[in-house]
């Protein structure tokens, strides 16, 4: 994890926190909000955070336990969605390269709003808002407690996730590159949970058994067939 203080504000925040591949980190924001960052995640916030607003900007995945402040809602702006909360616990997965963005609510209430449509949905605990970027559509589904946000405990978990998003997640955790020979299988879905120190070939074998894909490992590149 590294933290920078941007004197000349050229992006969205004065403070930027970044995790690298395979790295996870914890921090506490000035208002007492607790944040856990997953691998390859960038979080930014301004110097006036906690005074005039509680806006943060996220590219990647983070779990939040939000300090209560009814006068200043906590807002996560994340690659096409805004998530607003007052005091609650939730997870946002919003990597720039992923086809779907998810917000998972564990306690309290949050409002999730795509920036393009302004179609706001309200989540209750044990619900997930899934935003499909290609269709510009958001839907609310129940979540499996065994799968969501387990990355904080050292697990890689997928819940009906597209294969193309699973391989992006594996790239971030295993420092490899996936290449597809068959583009049509990117939309295959898979659910499962693995320890994040599990051998990559073991994970791929389980996915292969359940989806019928084939793969070949060429040093740091995995070819999906």
Q: Residue locations for each model-derived region?
A:
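A residue-level detector for the "anchor" residue at the start of short, highly conserved motifs
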Residues: 1-225
């Amino acid at each position: 994890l590294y933290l920078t203080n941007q004197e000349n504000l050229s992006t969205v925040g004065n403070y930027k926190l970044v995790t690298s591949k395979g790295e996870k980190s914890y921090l506490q924001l000035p208002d007492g909000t607790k944040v856990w960052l997953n691998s390859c995640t960038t979080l930014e916030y301004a110097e006036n955070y906690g005074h005039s607003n509680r806006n943060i900007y996220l590219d990647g995945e983070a779990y939040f336990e939000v300090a209560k402040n009814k006068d200043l809602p906590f807002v996560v702006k994340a690659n096409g969605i805004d998530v607003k909360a007052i005091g609650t616990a939730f997870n946002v997965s919003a990597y720039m390269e992923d086809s779907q963005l998810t917000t998972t609510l564990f306690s309290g209430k949050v409002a999730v709003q795509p920036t393009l449509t302004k179609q706001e949905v309200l989540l209750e605990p044990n619900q997930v808002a899934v935003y499909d970027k290609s269709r510009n559509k958001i839907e609310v589904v129940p979540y499996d407690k065994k799968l969501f946000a387990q990355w904080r405990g050292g697990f890689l978990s997928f819940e009906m996730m597209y294969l193309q998003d699973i391989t992006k997640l594996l790239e971030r955790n295993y420092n490899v590159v996936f290449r597809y020979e068959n583009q049509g299988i990117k939309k295959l879905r898979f659910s499962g949970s693995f320890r994040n120190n599990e051998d990559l070939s073991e994970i791929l074998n389980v996915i292969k058994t359940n989806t019928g894909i084939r793969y070949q490992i060429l040093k740091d590149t995995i070819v999906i067939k």
